[in-house]
């Protein structure tokens, strides 16, 4: 239902002559409004990797509003507490500077080429390294990631 809602919202916003940036942001939030957000650093890093900091914070607000609007059991305080905890974890992850993008990895495309990778294999390996770092941020050091890549070269098509 999220994909259909996002597509419909995009059309409505276009008909209402909203600017492209606003349309993109709103459609993205609607498309992700069913994503599971937890007060867990790994979950938060994944959301930040998917959406970026601004959109992740907006998504928290959208989810709070959505859940409170559907709150049939009178759980408003629990909902607000949960999303305050999620916001705190976002603050902690951002303050620590945890890696949440390929660009922020301690290695890059040049390192992959030096190891013999080319084309799509570079992106695949960097994305796999990001997945590792989202789970274990302490792995985001040049030497650790290069060793990890060397150990996983056979899993990647050069």
Which residues are covered by each model-predicted region?
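Divalent metal-dependent catalytic cores for phosphoryl transfer on phosphate-bearing substrates
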Residues: 1-84
């Amino acid at each position: 239902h999220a994909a259909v809602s996002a597509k419909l919202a995009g059309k409505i916003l276009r008909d209402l002559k909203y600017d492209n940036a606003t349309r993109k942001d709103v459609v993205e939030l609607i498309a992700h409004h069913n994503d599971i957000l937890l007060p867990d650093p790994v979950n938060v890093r994944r959301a930040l990797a998917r959406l970026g900091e601004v959109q992740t914070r907006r998504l928290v607000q959208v989810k709070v509003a959505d859940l409170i609007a559907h709150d049939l059991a009178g759980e408003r305080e629990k909902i607000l507490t949960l999303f305050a905890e999620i916001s705190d974890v976002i603050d902690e992850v951002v303050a620590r500077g945890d890696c949440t993008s390929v660009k922020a990895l301690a290695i890059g495309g040049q390192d992959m080429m030096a190891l013999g990778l080319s084309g799509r294999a570079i992106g695949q390996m960097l994305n796999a390294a990001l997945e590792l770092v989202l789970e274990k941020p302490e792995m985001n050091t040049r030497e650790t990631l290069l060793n990890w890549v060397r150990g996983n070269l056979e899993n990647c098509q050069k």
